[in-house]
Every structure is written in structure tokens, then in C-alpha cells.
């Protein structure tokens, strides 16, 4: 299997967009990208706007070759809406080009979902219906494409158990004896059953969102950080390569905060590192890029 990270925080944007190719099917996972309107009470830097456009173009190019699009949940950095959105670099035509002639495997729009995401899901489905594409709600389901199998988890919390941020779907893709797990927004994982679901899949490669340490003491507790570190250490000791990115890399000091994880295994890296690129933590360094440190 060929795995191409398209957009992650280490590449300068909010995203976990990934292209996964097997001999049977090409899958575009979580095709969304965004940058936050405010960080440190500052607007995006010029470098962030450029990175947003670059990743959007990468996602659109990847969509040209994809047969299947998967959507783990309905935050805008994980799917592309049928609306004009400046901070997501998209409009109606962007979405049409992305989803046209694809099979969309997506999280259920009304079950295990909060009000905000339910509204976004409803709008997305309206757009897909107008476009006339096929879609299925994938929660807990399995889909076969030749010797390739896509297996979705039951809904997992978007971080700690009881979070108001809703639920996400984990995705396992297998081809013969090769196994990849894409675990969007599990924030560590913090939630024990999310870790167990990943470990039971016995992955060669895991793409996972780390804990949002930039929110520590505000929307993310020290207790949850301890759980995330413990679970990540266990994951690092029992799986192959781990691409650890997304929420975690919104923090300038992410390596120090998760030093125990990086000491556990040499196989933990950011998407940029796996691609052989220099990390671009543009959101984390917005204050310095804006000259207002």
C-alpha cells in the first residue's frame, strides 16, 4: 500500500487528509483543511494562507485519482462543505470536483453526533444528493474492494469520554497482510476503548491525532494528558510506524510535553518527517511569524 499524507499540522495547516492506494482501490481519507481565524488573538500569517492553498490543491489533485472518500466526522478540517469558506479555501465547485463520481463512506449524520456536526452533516448530504453521488453511513461497517478491506469503528469520542465535541470513526485499511489505521481526532487516544480498538487491528502504520496540549488547563486537563501519554506509550510499544500529528503539533513544545512517548520508540514521527520535509508549525508559531511575539 502507498500512503501519502496530504495535510497535517506539521505541513502548516489543520488537517489529517491522507491518500491511501492499494492495487484494488484508492481512498481519500478526511479530505478537509483549514486554518483558524484567530490564534494568540492574531489572524493567519501569509505563510499560513500559502500553506492552506497548497494543501487544498493537493487534496483536489488526490481526489482526481480516488475511488472512495471517507469522512470520520464533520469538522471542517476533516471534510469539504458545499459552501464558500475562506479559512477552508473552498466553495461549491471545490466540493463538486472533490466528491463527483466517488463512493462516500461517512459517519452517520444523526446518531452519536452533536448539534453542530449534525447541521454540517445535513448540509453535506444535501450537496451529495444534488450531485447524485453514492454514499453510505459507515459506522461499524466493513467494505471489500477486491483484496482490500475498509473497516470502520463504532463511533469513538472526539477525545475524552463525555466530550461535547461529538464522535469520530476510526478506519482500518487492509490489503493482504498490510494494515493501516487512520484515527482522526481521538486526541491521544485519551479514551481507553479507542486505544484497544486500534491495538486489536494490529497495524503496521497508525496515523493518529495527538492530545491538544495547547489547550492544557483550558479545555484539556492534566489528567487527560496523563491518559494520552500512557496510551500512546502502549501504542508505540506494540505497533509499527506511528504518524503522530494534528492537535499535538499546535503546540511549540509538543516534543517536550510528550517526551516519554518519543523515548518509547524511534518509530514515532510527524507527517512532515515521514515525508522527509521540514516541519512547518505555522499555527503554533503565528505570534512569531506575525512579529508580535
UniProtKB/Swiss-Prot annotation:
Pfam families, per database record: Lactamase_B_3 (PF13483)
Domain of life according to the entry: Archaea
Transmembrane annotation, as ranges: none
SUPFAM superfamilies assigned to the protein according to its UniProt record, in alphabetical order: Metallo-hydrolase/oxidoreductase
InterPro entries: RibonucZ/Hydroxyglut_hydro, UPF0173_UPF0282_UlaG_hydrolase, UPF0282_hydrls
Similarity-based family: Belongs to the UPF0282 family.
Protein name as annotated: UPF0282 protein MK0213
Amino acid at each position: 500500500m502507498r500512503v501519502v499524507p496530504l495535510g497535517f499540522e506539521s505541513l502548516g495547516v489543520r488537517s489529517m487528509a491522507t491518500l491511501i492506494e492499494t492495487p484494488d482501490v484508492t481512498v481519500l481519507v478526511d479530505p478537509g483543511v483549514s486554518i483558524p481565524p484567530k490564534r494568540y488573538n492574531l489572524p493567519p500569517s501569509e505563510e499560513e494562507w500559502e500553506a492552506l492553498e497548497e494543501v487544498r490543491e493537493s487534496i483536489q489533485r488526490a481526489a482526481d485519482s480516488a475511488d472512495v472518500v471517507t469522512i470520520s466526522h464533520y469538522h471542517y478540517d476533516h471534510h469539504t462543505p458545499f459552501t464558500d469558506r475562506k479559512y477552508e479555501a473552498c466553495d461549491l465547485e471545490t466540493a463538486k470536483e472533490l466528491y463527483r463520481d466517488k463512493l462516500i463512506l461517512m459517519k452517520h449524520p444523526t446518531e452519536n453526533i452533536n448539534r453542530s456536526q449534525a447541521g454540517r452533516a445535513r448540509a453535506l448530504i444535501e450537496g451529495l444528493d444534488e450531485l447524485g453521488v453514492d454514499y453510505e453511513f459507515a459506522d461499524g461497517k466493513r467494505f471489500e474492494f477486491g483484496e482490500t478491506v475498509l473497516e470502520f469503528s463504532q463511533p469513538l469520542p472526539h477525545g475524552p469520554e463525555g466530550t461535547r465535541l461529538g464522535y469520530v470513526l476510526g478506519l482500518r485499511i487492509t490489503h493482504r497482510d498490510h494494515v493501516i489505521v487512520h484515527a482522526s481526532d481521538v486526541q491521544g487516544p485519551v479514551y481507553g476503548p479507542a486505544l484497544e480498538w486500534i491495538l486489536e487491528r494490529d497495524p503496521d502504520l497508525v496515523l493518529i491525532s495527538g492530545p491538544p496540549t495547547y489547550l492544557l488547563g483550558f479545555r484539556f486537563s492534566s489528567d487527560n494528558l496523563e491518559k494520552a501519554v500512557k496510551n500512546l506509550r502502549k501504542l508505540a510499544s506494540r505497533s509499527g510506524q506511528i504518524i503522530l500529528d494534528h492537535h499535538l503539533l499546535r503546540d511549540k513544545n509538543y516534543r517536550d510535553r510528550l517526551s516519554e512517548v518519543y523515548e518509547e520508540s524511534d518509530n514515532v514521527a510527524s507527517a512532515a518527517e515521514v515525508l522527509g520535509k521540514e516541519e512547518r508549525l505555522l499555527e503554533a508559531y503565528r505570534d512569531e511569524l506575525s512579529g508580535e511575539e
